[in-house]
């Protein structure tokens, strides 16, 4: 499951490079005849303006109005990329690479990767109106299935209504085929598999159902440290549970180097014991760290809390345990670990092992609560961590009682993943305690795939909802949950158990998480080509980019970001607009994305047909 490092790709041939200009040979000619980058810049600007005007005057014919719109967008992107001012912001010149490479400069050609070539191949196709984007991937599938597109200007009334309805049923057939690739934990087959796994584990641990369904037993028996590795080894020896030597060694290396690893027995039973990394790909990747991650974390063992504090939390904490980035809400972190550790955790620089030391002590917690009491701007308090449901009911009650006295606080939100990692934590007592809180109380949880949604999750959610507590989901759209319609399958499963999709996060570009990254373009594509096929009440999540220090911002479109450069390795460079835009002056944030080509290669490795993703290049 390792991703090829970029240096392993071969140097691009000059001919391959020249080929990309075939939709717009004029661009190649300008690069050829220009004596300098500056000359090329001026001439390309003139050319683009003329091309734009020809389009706007209707002198260029397009197969479809959408392809015409895309051509205008692509011209804008190209102008952005060749703009001198954007070069200043990006810190380098994309145009210089294009110009040098066109002149056959070997150094430039050596540096340029396939990802760069592909970006420009598609950009030039789009600018010339030949992208065929309007058909999308679904349109192509429909044509393959022999479905005829109906011209609704030719038929009317009931006839049109029936034709459209029949056509939409065909669309659903394709959608259903994709969704069915992702088994849900509510499927009978999976429920039976898990029942068997539970029995195997109960026998292995020498316990009864009663202990299994008791969260205290689950918490006490979290697989962690060297003991956890030993248990996984033993389990492999005496049961049908499969795990590779490689995985065991990586986990062992992680725990020996103080990198937190934690896995609840409950979550372990979600694994497919006999077929690793097929149906349970996302579940295993949730907790088993890839080698690269472990290496990077070891490299930065000493300065981890600086190197990996990607969100700049050190600079947004007015007092210990509190993080404030917004006007009316701040975070309090009363427990700095979780029963289960997510490999891609953005707080990986601070999470500790799951034990008593992760509780900072009442003195600190009370001081942090005092801070909330003193700030009447705080209308909501987000209690997270770590996982606050690691704390006892008593501790939770104590915090809530204190917050109940703060008149300005309207609501409390808990950020917890126990609903997924140890759903038995949601006892009747806890649900009633939370339900008895007189202010608004909600929970945001973190379900990554429909495979994690089980009858146990459904029961935990039901207990909370009968106590008037709403549960929202924060989904991290990482590489192993980002396939076609995978997020759609998740949204449907969430809806079945009563969890409301809230955020779909772009997995931030933290280098130790390289194997989990997904380009922004894939999120944008998912929203448009997949989520859009669901009813509005199912697609309530917003795509979000977390701007370091500043806070979360939407990833909707050009009102939130601008593509300003393409690195020779194919990474897009964006200017991200923070949420404060239009509220007070603030700096934009320059961000380098993961190359689309690298992402597509990794999808191919997990068996995807990347032809089905090819419109991704047209999401800027
Ligand atoms: C995410 C986050 C919140 C909550 O933001 P919402 O948009 O209300 O979900 C609050 N404070 C901090 C520091 C956060 O990172």
Curated annotation (Swiss-Prot):
[4Fe-4S] cluster binds at residues 338, 342, 345. Residues 324-586 form the Radical SAM core domain. Its cofactor is [4Fe-4S] cluster; pyridoxal 5'-phosphate. Binds 1 [4Fe-4S] cluster. The cluster is coordinated with 3 cysteines and an exchangeable S-adenosyl-L-methionine. Keywords: 4Fe-4S, Iron, Iron-sulfur, Metal-binding, Pyridoxal phosphate, S-adenosyl-L-methionine. GO terms for molecular function: 4 iron, 4 sulfur cluster binding; catalytic activity; metal ion binding. The modification N6-(pyridoxal phosphate)lysine is found at residue 552. Gene3D superfamilies: 6.10.140.1170, Aldolase class I. PANTHER family: L-LYSINE 2,3-AMINOMUTASE AQ_1632-RELATED, LYSINE 2,3-AMINOMUTASE-RELATED. Belongs to the radical SAM superfamily. KamA family. This is Uncharacterized KamA family protein MJ0634.
């Amino acid at each position: 499951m390792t991703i090829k490092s970029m240096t392993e790709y071969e140097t691009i041939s000059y001919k391959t490079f020249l080929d990309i200009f075939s939709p717009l040979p004029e661009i190649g000619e300008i690069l050829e005849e220009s004596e300098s980058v500056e000359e090329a810049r001026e001439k390309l600007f003139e050319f683009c303006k003329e091309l734009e005007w020809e389009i706007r005057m209707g002198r260029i014919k397009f197969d479809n109005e959408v392809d015409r719109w895309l051509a205008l967008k692509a011209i804008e992107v190209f102008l952005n990329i060749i703009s001198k001012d954007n070069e200043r912001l990006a810190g380098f010149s994309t145009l210089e690479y294009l110009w040098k490479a066109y002149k056959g400069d070997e150094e430039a050609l050596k540096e340029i990767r396939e990802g760069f070539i592909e970006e420009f191949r598609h950009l030039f196709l789009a600018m010339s109106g030949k992208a065929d984007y309007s058909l999308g991937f679904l349109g192509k599938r429909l044509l393959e299935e022999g479905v005829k597109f109906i011209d609704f200007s030719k038929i009317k009334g009931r006839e049109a209504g029936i034709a459209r309805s029949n056509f939409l049923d065909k669309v659903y057939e394709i959608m259903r085929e994709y969704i069915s690739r992702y088994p849900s934990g509510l499927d009978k087959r999976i429920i039976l598999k898990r029942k068997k796994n539970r029995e195997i584990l109960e026998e292995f641990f020498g316990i009864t159902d009663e202990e299994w369904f008791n969260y205290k037993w689950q918490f006490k028996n979290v697989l962690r440290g060297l003991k956890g590795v030993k248990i996984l080894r033993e389990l492999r020896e005496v049961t049908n549970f499969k795990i590779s030597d490689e995985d065991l060694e990586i986990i062992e290396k992680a725990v020996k180097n103080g990198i937190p690893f934690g896995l609840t027995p409950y979550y372990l039973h979600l694994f497919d014991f006999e077929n690793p990394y097929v149906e349970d790909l996302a579940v295993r990747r949730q907790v088993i760290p890839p080698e690269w991650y472990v290496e990077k974390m070891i490299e930065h063992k000493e300065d981890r809390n600086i190197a990996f504090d990607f969100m700049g939390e050190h600079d947004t904490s007015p007092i210990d345990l509190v993080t404030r980035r917004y006007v009316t809400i701040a975070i309090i972190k009363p427990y700095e670990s979780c029963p289960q550790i997510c490999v891609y955790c953005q707080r990986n620089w601070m999470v500790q092992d799951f034990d008593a030391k992760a509780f900072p002590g009442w003195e600190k917690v009370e001081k942090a609560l005092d801070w909330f009491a003193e700030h009447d701007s705080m209308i909501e308090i987000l209690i997270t961590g770590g996982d606050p449901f690691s704390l006892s009911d008593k501790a939770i009650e104590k915090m809530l009682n204190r917050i109940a006295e703060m008149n300005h606080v309207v609501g409390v939100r808990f950020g917890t993943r126990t609903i997924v990692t140890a759903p038995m934590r949601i006892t009747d007592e806890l649900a009633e305690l939370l339900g008895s809180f007189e202010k608004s109380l909600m929970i945001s949880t973190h379900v990554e795939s429909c495979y994690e949604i089980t009858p146990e999750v459904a029961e935990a959610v039901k207990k909370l909802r009968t106590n008037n507590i709403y549960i929202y989901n924060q989904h991290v759209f990482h590489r192993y949950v980002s396939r076609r319609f995978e997020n759609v399958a998740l949204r449907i499963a969430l809806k079945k158990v009563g969890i409301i999709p809230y955020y779909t996060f772009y997995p931030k570009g933290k280098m130790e998480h390289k194997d989990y990254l997904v380009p922004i373009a894939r999120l944008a594509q998912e929203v448009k080509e997949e989520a859009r096929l669901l009813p509005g009440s199912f697609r309530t999540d917003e795509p979000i980019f977390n701007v370091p220090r500043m806070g979360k911002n939407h990833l909707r479109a050009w009102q939130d970001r601008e593509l300003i450069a393409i690195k020779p390795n194919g990474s897009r460079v964006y200017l991200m607009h923070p949420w404060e835009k239009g509220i007070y002056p603030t700096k934009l944030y320059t961000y380098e994305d993961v190359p689309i080509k690298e992402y597509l290669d990794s999808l191919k490795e997990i068996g995807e047909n990347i032809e089905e993703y090819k419109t991704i290049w047209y999401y800027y």
